[in-house]
Regions:
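Short, Lys/Arg-enriched N-terminal segments with co-localized hydrophobic residues
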Residues: 1-5
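N-terminal small-domain helix-loop-helix segment of the aminotransferase-like
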Residues: 7-110
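Conserved core of the PLP fold type I
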Residues: 70-211, 217, 223-228
């Protein structure tokens, strides 16, 4: 008998799968080299097309020149640098009027890591997480690797707000979290205030009925680029 592979097949399949977004990005790069990037409209990866604010660059240069190397390049506390968490909490409280403190802030290397931690925190294997179509395809592996199951609520095709009829039908006792993404990738839709209020009311009602909290996880990488 030959040697048996000890690699996890499910993970191998995930890594070998093709990403349409990456394929589009590679095609856009190739076309840009052929006809000039200014002639290519690239709707694949969400890379910014505007320069970094000068204030940010100046601050980074200042820190590199004045901070101790270990402070900049050494290990940070597990929850993140305290002063950074304090600054974020202060900013959120100022902007949204909610009593955030540093104890409410957990730093992660990007939204993917933060979502993965959140899913692991609120689910056990076999639990369900609901999200709404259309959705960012990477949600599937983030949830799958926890042992939970991602269930997708079909869209309201008229306006891509939440399809509440389908949502309430799928919101069973097995659901431990609901994942929203607004502004939405890929539709660009922003959930209205009435939509979000109705969603919150339903989750409160069902949490009470089922005897456990149904968490609302909000993925907001595009929150700052909402244009009127």
């Amino acid at each position: 008998m030959g040697e048996r592979s000890m690699l996890v097949q499910k993970y191998k399949d995930m890594l070998s799968g093709k990403s349409v977004i990456r394929q589009l990005s590679e095609f856009a790069t190739a076309r840009g080299q052929e006809i000039g990037y200014e002639n290519v409209f690239d709707y694949s990866l969400g890379n910014p097309s505007v320069p970094v604010p000068r204030e940010f660059t100046d601050r980074m240069i200042h820190m590199l020149a004045t901070k101790e190397p270990l402070e900049l390049h050494g290990y940070s506390p597990s929850l993140g640098i305290t002063s950074v968490r304090e600054a974020i909490a202060e900013n959120l409280e100022k902007r949204f009027g909610l009593p955030y403190r540093k104890e409410h802030i957990f730093m992660a290397s990007g939204a993917a890591g933060a979502l993965a931690h959140a899913f692991r925190l609120v689910t056990e294997p076999g639990d369900e997480i609901l999200t709404f179509a259309p959705f960012f395809p990477e949600y599937h592996p983030y949830v799958d690797l926890t042992g939970a199951v991602l269930k997708v609520v079909p869209p309201n095709l008229e306006n891509f707000q939440i399809n509440f009829e389908a949502f309430e039908e799928m919101l069973t006792e097995k659901v431990k979290a609901v994942l929203i993404n607004t502004p939405n990738n890929p539709s660009g839709v922003v959930y209205s205030t009435p939509t979000l209020q109705r969603l919150a009311d339903i989750l409160r009602e069902k949490s009470k009925e089922y005897g456990h909290i149904i968490y609302l996880i909000s993925d907001e990488p595009y929150r700052e680029i909402v244009f009127e």
